[in-house]
């Protein structure tokens, strides 16, 4: 009876610890990079992309082998392959309480072959950047073409009106009207 009570208590404590610990293993977190020091995962639920600025927003977590997890909010600038770390939260493995947090606004270009470069490539594919940017550029070109056509038509109408006025003035001068 006592063994059962002890086992039930241990099970309850383990379950509570597992529920309250900060976990980055559910379906919303997709792996994008690993090395001997850390693993990077991106949050699929918070990805967004703005083709007018060619910038994506993403949250990523870096799970370190030394027992820390760093959750970061990024702006990813595809035009120059740089990232801006906006906010960060650092957790100890197994804890749901951040031991450090802050606002960084630190922009940098990741080194080739690094986790930051892998983050850019992963987010680029996940948000469909190339397709959305091509669609945006086509839409902008189409709108510019429509505006140019409208400008040409307005210019032609103004020239026609000016020619008509000039001819009318000439006829008035000839006939003395």
Regions inferred by a protein language model and the residue ranges of each:
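Sec-dependent N-terminal signal peptides
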Residues: 4-15
């Amino acid at each position: 009876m006592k063994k059962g009570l002890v086992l039930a208590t241990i099970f309850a404590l383990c379950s509570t610890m597992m529920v309250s610990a900060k976990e980055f293993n559910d379906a919303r977190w997709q792996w994008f990079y690993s090395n001997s020091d850390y693993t990077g995962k991106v949050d699929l639920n918070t990805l967004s992309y703005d083709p007018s600025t060619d910038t994506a927003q993403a949250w990523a977590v870096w799970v370190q082998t030394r027992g820390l997890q760093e959750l970061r909010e990024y702006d990813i600038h595809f035009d120059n392959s740089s990232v801006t770390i906006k906010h960060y939260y650092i957790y100890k493995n197994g804890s749901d309480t951040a031991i450090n947090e802050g606002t960084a606004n630190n922009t940098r270009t990741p080194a080739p072959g690094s986790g930051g470069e892998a983050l850019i490539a992963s987010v680029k594919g996940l948000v469909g950047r190339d397709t959305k940017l091509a669609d945006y550029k086509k839409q902008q070109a189409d709108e510019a073409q429509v505006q140019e056509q409208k400008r040409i038509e307005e210019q032609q109408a103004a020239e026609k009106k000016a020619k008509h006025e000039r001819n009318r003035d000439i006829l008035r001068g000839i006939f003395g009207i």
